[in-house]
């Protein structure tokens, strides 16, 4: 059974975006970029909410960035009740119950399922207990407010740190799994 891996970038104070919207691009350490590219290339499916889908679908098809090829080639599922169709190649729309749709994706063959967010989608996955691994890239910036990574959780989300890496820029990569889970397949 495939695992769901949530990949998110946050500020040191836990916000996905600042009080005025999008966080903006901070310099990405080359070592982190190589790590992320390898992880993305191994993925079997990318999942995301509508807003993230629309941002990515507008960017990746014409991008020359190193991430573009795997982002365009790997199947993507956008979770939305309002999106009529997914026009980004290798994309489809899931409109059913979140837990049922994720269960169906887990049963399919292939690599891990990477969830990209946005924050509302990430929170829905977390509240439903559907995330097997959290890959958090903590940027060396504080927003003092904005859109939080976690909110409205029914209970405390207890996590076990399974990997941590610090980069010269001050960016830190933390990988967690929910404390109540045994080691998921592949990690």
Give the predicted meaning of each segment.
Residues 1-187:
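Enzymes that bind and transform nitrogen-containing heteroaromatic metabolites
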